[in-house]
């Protein structure tokens, strides 16, 4: 059979025949020719469409825009979203507001909707409540409704009368940044500082559990200082959740701060 030893392995021997060597050569040659042919075809197609590249890019942009509009229309229709009304004041009123993502993963009809009523007199909401009581979801829901409305999408609620925000700042969750060598508390302070420095009276600020990354009384002092600064200097719509129930006295200082409580049943 004209077998020739080709390779010795620890548990086997490999042999080859002239016919197999010829077949191997043909296969390798065919693969090389295929790669070269693919490149030739690629360059031909590239040169052919080069003259129309700007037209194709314009078409792609139109298709992308249609895709976005279709997606927004479909999600709004399937989930009974409504068209928001925009106002020029700091009035943020939502009836039966929902978190569009969470309600999709819960059993149908089990999501509990929430109203939102914020006006010029009390633009800052101080939110307290137990863990897993829905504070973070409530705030995320408001941010999503604001963002969805401003990109031209209907929003998940029964009614919505909301302002147009120039910026939305959020400080939600607790995580460190090991790559940058930043602790959980450092990340928290940097993100909060960004909001306090650049927010205007037309911005939306959402702070979730500020100060929990450090000692109890230090965190409480930081949280109080931030909320008082927002209420007296920035004066924008703000949702500030906290587990420091001692801060609820701030409502009595007439700074435009209103206490709200999330209860779990």
Predicted regions and their residues:
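A conserved P-loop NTPase coupling/switch region
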Residues: 1-62, 88
């Amino acid at each position: 059979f004209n077998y020739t030893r080709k390779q010795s392995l620890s548990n086997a021997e490999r042999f080859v025949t002239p016919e197999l060597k010829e077949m191997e050569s043909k296969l390798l040659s065919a693969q090389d020719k295929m790669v070269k042919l693919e490149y030739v075809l690629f360059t031909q197609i590239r040169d052919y469409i080069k003259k129309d590249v700007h037209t194709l890019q314009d078409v792609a942009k139109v298709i992308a825009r249609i895709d976005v509009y279709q997606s927004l229309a479909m999600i709004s229709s399937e989930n009974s979203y409504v068209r928001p009304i925009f106002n020029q004041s700091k009035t943020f009123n939502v009836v039966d507001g929902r978190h569009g993502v969470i309600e999709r993963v819960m059993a149908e009809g089990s999501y509990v909707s929430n109203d939102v009523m914020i006006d010029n007199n009390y633009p800052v909401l101080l939110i307290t409540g137990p863990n897993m009581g829905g504070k973070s979801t409530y705030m995320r829901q408001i941010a999503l409704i604001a963002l969805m409305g401003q990109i031209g999408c209907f929003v998940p609620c029964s009614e919505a009368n909301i302002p147009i925000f120039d910026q939305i700042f959020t400080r939600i969750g607790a995580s460190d940044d090991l790559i940058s060598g930043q602790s959980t508390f450092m990340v928290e302070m940097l993100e909060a500082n960004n909001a306090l420095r650049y927010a205007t009276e037309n911005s939306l600020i959402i702070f979730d559990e500020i100060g929990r990354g450090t000692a109890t009384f230090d965190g409480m002092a930081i949280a109080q200082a931030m909320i008082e600064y927002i209420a007296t200097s920035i004066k924008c719509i703000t949702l500030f959740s906290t587990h420091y129930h001692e801060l609820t006295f701030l409502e009595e200082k007439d700074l435009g701060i209103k206490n709200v409580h999330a209860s779990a049943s």
